[in-house]
Amino acid sequence: MGVAIRVIPCLDVDNGRVVKGVNFENLRDAGDPVELAKRYDEEGADELTFLDVTASKHGRGTMLDVVRRTADQVFIPLTVGGGVRSEEDVDQLLRAGADKVSVNTSAIARPELLSELSKRFGAQCIVLSVDARRVPEGGTPQPSGFEVTTHGGSKSAELDAIEWAKRGEELGVGEILLNSMDGDGTKNGFDLELLEKVRAAVSIPVIASGGAGKAEHFPPAVAAGANAVLAATIFHFREVTIAEVKGAIKDAGFEVRK
């Protein structure tokens, strides 16, 4: 038996509120991340990811409060990312109840941050989030044809995305969160070529993100090498349920958690 494929809803949180509107019935407060986390837990999510999109400094304290309240009521693993720049940031999030912390832009500026974090907190706690896209026309060519981006996909980091994922593994991260910026929001399916290339380059788990539009999009991502699949909008707006995604993955011959 292989390892079960994980299904992970992602919530964007701004100053303690869920951003991408959420369409659950019977929720007292659809903007409360804790309410949503509980609902996803009940619906069979294997893990949850919170992405803190708060620009302001004071937002950090609010996020810690959200993490604390979630950890009190939800017992599936919780990953938190967004604005993580230092050991202190990670320490605070883990103490508040996060199980894993994802690091993105700050590692591009200073890759050794990843090895410092994995040495101190353990590889299993540190996720490298990679916002990747095909190199656009006129962009700096990269060996794989894929580049790393920052600022929500608007700026090139002038790094090869596959090489960067590999470097992350060498520096000690336990998992890669692979976001396809080309796929993000399109609902046309995951970028399978990107997934296959990263899968061939690393041996740590890869979470596929960006592009899911329906349940049928998930099994090809798993076949391309994803150990976990992540989506936001389609879960929030009830376009697809977690049970439907797990059903599709199982029907394709892969193992899922009940």
Swiss-Prot record:
The active site is at residues 12, 131. Its EC number is 4.3.2.10. It comes from Corynebacterium glutamicum (strain ATCC 13032 / DSM 20300 / JCM 1318 / BCRC 11384 / CCUG 27702 / LMG 3730 / NBRC 12168 / NCIMB 10025 / NRRL B-2784 / 534). One of its GO terms (biological process) is L-histidine biosynthetic process. One of its GO terms (molecular function) is imidazoleglycerol-phosphate synthase activity. This is Imidazole glycerol phosphate synthase subunit HisF. HAMAP family: HisF. Heterodimer of HisH and HisF.
